[in-house]
Amino acid sequence: MKHIEFRINLIKEKVKNYIIDNKINSLIIGVSGGLDSGVNCILLKNVCDELNIPLIGRYIHIETNKEEEANAAKLIGNNYCTSFDMKDLTNDYFFTIYDDYPNNTQLKTEYSKSETESELQYKIRLGNIKARLRMIHLYNLSQKYKGLVIDNDNLTEQLLGFWTLHGDVGDLTPLSSLYKTDVYNVANFLFDKEESESKKTAIKAIIDITPTDGLGITNSDFEQFGVKSYNEIDEILKSFKEPSLSNIRDKYGDSFEKVLNRYINSEYKRNNPFRIKS
């Protein structure tokens, strides 16, 4: 417990110092209804209140988002954000991919499925458009209110390349040193310490919700990764750097290979853009 509290305080202190050093006037956050954005809202509220700057939250629905995501986002946003609103960019998305929408729902040629694409690859491509539309909205707010966009990625997602380039990333990443299982531990710690019933309800909602990318690609993160749980994923990822966990490959077999391949194949995203030295 003390270790978790120490990491929470360290994150808040570093965010606070960054805001002060760079004279930031506001923080903008996309509130998805998921665990990571919810935990960020909770941690950042304390910092923003102390510095007297707004935490501006937006839930942005696009076509495939589920009602439970919207409900969880509303609970978090109303409890922790200075300003919170729910937007629907479904029509913006449809205007992008369809010819003559709303009169016609024929896909524009560049957004149709190619002969060489699998169904999953095609869904990822369209999902990336949704992520980038959301980020257009959030970065517009950041310029309007002279703020920073919060990146809700955690260490697990970074190592798996589980984000959209020029999409669902941001300027400041509070959870960048926490594996997904660590984020769950932080959320449970915050739940246990919280006295307000409305806030406890909000925290429980983000802990219990099925983790998804919010892009309608698959029904869960686990389905997309081909594994059973984040405990499994994080143990595999940690084994890449810790020799004492060398038996993990035998323990998880096919799941290990899937995580390893995803880690290797997403290296380009962690080193983007590739800079030519001359």
Language model feature labels by segment:
Residues 1-161, 187:
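ATP-dependent adenylation/nucleotidyltransferase module used to activate substrates
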Residues 2-6, 10-13, 17, 258-278:
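N-terminal charge/polar-biased segments
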Residues 151-264, 271, 278:
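Mid-to-C-terminal catalytic subdomains of enzymes
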